[in-house]
A protein has these predicted regions:
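Solvent-exposed loop/turn segments at secondary-structure junctions
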Residues: 65-68, 95-99, 126-129, 162-163, ...
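C-terminal cap of thioredoxin/glutaredoxin-like
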Residues: 5, 146-228
């Protein structure tokens, strides 16, 4: 099944409109049902996860320049604040082309400095509200300098082995999930959902709740005596 993202895809960066949902997350997921192959996809070869033992991982794939990622970010952020304690959520920036890499590295520099909470939303705002160009290392470093991160320090981290490794692993994870558009969600290395499957960004989180429960049940079954 070919996936075409509701927002920005690797094949096309055209924008598309999306609707809203008024039903509670679990209620709508259960009411409409979630079907493999339509509402979500099962990954043939499980993708690697970084969640602590016993936790279920949810990965948000995004790109700072994507307008729909900008719109989805508050939804995902609100969702993470209400997620169950056995769920571990993280973000990973995609790089469909080489020119995506500067913003991919930007995220990991912020992560290395412990400034994601402070500056992640400000990056989106700079691009989509202030219309700043943050496409190259120099442009991004100049912006970071205005946020209190000295340009030299930013570029040192930007070009560091640590950030290079994180960027490479991020792209590998993107490929493992066969992500071809953003925003999208990977669940516990086994499932993938997005606007294409779920039809709206809100419902992609509803489907994610359903897949978390599926993962929880599978983990519980594996933990029973005699299972391996």
């Amino acid at each position: 099944m070919q996936r075409r993202e509701f927002s920005v895809s690797a094949a096309s960066l055209a924008a598309a409109a999306f609707g809203a949902s008024a039903l509670p997350i679990r209620a709508q997921a259960q009411a409409k049902g979630c079907q493999n192959g339509s509402d979500y996809l099962t990954i043939a070869k499980p993708a690697p996860t970084e969640a602590p033992a016993g936790q279920i991982e949810v990965v948000e794939f995004f790109w700072y320049n994507c307008p729909h990622c900008n719109a989805f970010e508050p939804m995902f952020d609100a969702w993470t604040k209400k997620m169950p304690k056995d769920v571990h959520a993280r973000r990973t920036p995609v790089a469909f082309r080489p020119d995506f890499e500067p913003q991919q590295r930007l995220y990991f520099v912020l992560e290395s400095l412990g400034k994601v909470d402070e500056l992640h939303k400000k990056v989106f705002n700079a691009i989509h509200v202030e219309r700043q160009q943050l496409a190259t290392a120099d442009q991004i470093a100049a912006w970071a300098d205005k946020q209190g991160i000295p340009k030299a320090k930013f570029l040192e981290l930007y070009n560091s082995f640590s950030v290079s490794t994180k960027a490479r692993k991020s792209t590998q994870l993107q490929d493992a999930y066969a992500v071809d558009g953003v925003p999208a969600l990977g669940i516990n290395g086994r499932y993938f959902t997005s606007g294409t499957q779920a039809k709206t960004p809100e419902r992609s989180l509803q489907v994610t709740d359903y897949l978390i429960e599926q993962s929880r049940q599978a983990m519980s079954a594996m933990a029973k005596p005699g299972k391996s």
